[in-house]
């Protein structure tokens, strides 16, 4: 099974990369992700012209999300230039290194020339710059003048105009988009202490992890549809091999993961890579490239002929469908019984059935 992927001159033996963050916060961590976890490429923690002043604690983990106020690297750029990147390049097995930098045009004028010799490509965070597309365009044009390396602009989940973002970076010379950065601002309150327990000086943090996967998928799809020539790297919510495939189907050429590994263990990188061949085979794919080249189907249906049908052999009689039905249309009589007049054909019960015993009935065309 061929799980390799190629884009913008980069060749990855598998499509999974770490996202910029604490797990790639120095050379030893990056080498672990490359050689132990087996990632297809390495993305370094974001470097800026100033080292970040980070509050503590700065990371909060819940079941399906991470909240962080960690900002970018806590180390000065000189430590990356003189120590981390040289050490990584010396001991690397040669997988692509994507150097993450942020944030403004003025930052780029300092960082790109200083880091160009280490980078196989750049990822550029716009997280704290705002939504000004004119300023974005100027930043992209500046980067293009400063390097011949491919570079990808990272879009935040709260960007109101992803199509405009994509068009702006394309016409100014970027190779692609990394979609998406964390979502926010967000907040965590401890009721017992009447306290905001994580956050910056305003009490705010940023949310990532499986919780934001559907937002990330929609952004990847939107950008690839709007600007097909741009490379898209998907990030936000990946936690399994099937998640990887979903992002590739949505339009990504590669993917990044961070939060799920922080919630479930760093061994998750190797597990996803190991699981990918069998998961591809399960869904009838022969390679990652085939997934990327698959046209995603979509059909909007207005109305369904009948309520969902029940497979009595699968039904566990758990009653979940009846308890959650917002239209009070299901009663349990051993198996679910639908009131056709009350049933709105909304689909909630089908999506929530734990044993997949319910099936839609689409209206005749």
Which role fits each region the language model picked out?
Residues 63-133:
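Active-site beta->alpha loop and helix N-cap motifs at the rims of alpha/beta catalytic domains
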Residues 66-68, 124-135, 165-230, 264:
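Glycine/Thr-rich beta-alpha phosphate-binding loop at enzyme active sites
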Residues 44-50, 123-129, 176-186, 237-238, ...:
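Glycine-rich phosphate-binding active-site loops on the catalytic face of alpha/beta enzymes
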Residues 67-93, 136-155, 199-232, 272-285:
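Alpha-helix-loop-beta-strand connector modules within alpha/beta enzyme cores
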Residues 2-6, 27-91, 136:
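Glycine-rich, positively charged N-terminal anion/phosphate-binding segment
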Residues 53-67, 187-204, 248-249, 260-285:
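C-terminal helical cap(s) of enzyme catalytic domains, especially alpha/beta-barrels
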Residues 320-337, 348-364:
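Iron-sulfur cluster-binding cysteine motifs and their immediate structural context
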Residues 28-32, 108-116, 159-172, 223-227, ...:
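Catalytic cores of alpha/beta
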